[in-house]
């Protein structure tokens, strides 16, 4: 996904590009704003920008072409997602759900597009009356994943969708 695919947010996209070009990229960014403003789409396009360069960069380089191919399917090994999950009846009573429990459902949702709602995600997970949260086990898993060395030698990125649902 390229910045050009994000609706609006021109000033923010320009500022993000400028931070990268100047080498002043912080270790964490929080994208916040009203519901429906494309924060997730912006975060995902910025992750693509960091992992594979901008859309005008020469794509003939094998590493850039490879990164772009992985990002087309949102399967880049240095891009990780954390998101609210539910406890399914089939899970043991002591199991705290983590994002990897719902990786297939998440992948299906983001492949449909980067603009989606919590209701769409709940439906994708098969939720009935549960509340979706980001568990303590997810925080542990995130720490474990981010402690690993970058697979492709560049950035490691974690996108936490709806961090306000951390419990």
What are these regions (language model features)?
Residues 2-165:
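Clamp-loader machinery-focused feature within the broader ASCE/P-loop NTPase space
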């Amino acid at each position: 996904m390229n910045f050009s695919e994000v609706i609006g947010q021109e000033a923010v996209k320009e500022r993000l590009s400028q931070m990268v070009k100047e080498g002043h990229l912080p270790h964490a960014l929080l994208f916040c704003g009203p519901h429906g403003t494309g924060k997730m789409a912006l975060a995902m396009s910025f992750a693509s920008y960091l992992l594979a360069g901008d859309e005008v960069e020469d794509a003939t380089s094998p590493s850039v072409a490879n990164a772009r191919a992985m990002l087309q399917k949102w399967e880049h090994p240095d891009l990780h997602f954390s998101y609210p999950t539910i406890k399914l009846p089939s899970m043991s009573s002591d199991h705290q759900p983590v994002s990897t429990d719902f990786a297939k459902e998440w992948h299906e949702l983001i492949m449909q597009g980067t603009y989606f709602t919590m209701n769409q995600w709940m439906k994708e997970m098969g939720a009935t009356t549960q509340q979706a949260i980001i568990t303590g086990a997810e925080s542990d898993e995130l720490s474990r994943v981010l402690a690993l060395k970058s697979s492709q030698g560049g950035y490691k990125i974690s996108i936490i969708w709806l961090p306000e649902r951390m419990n």
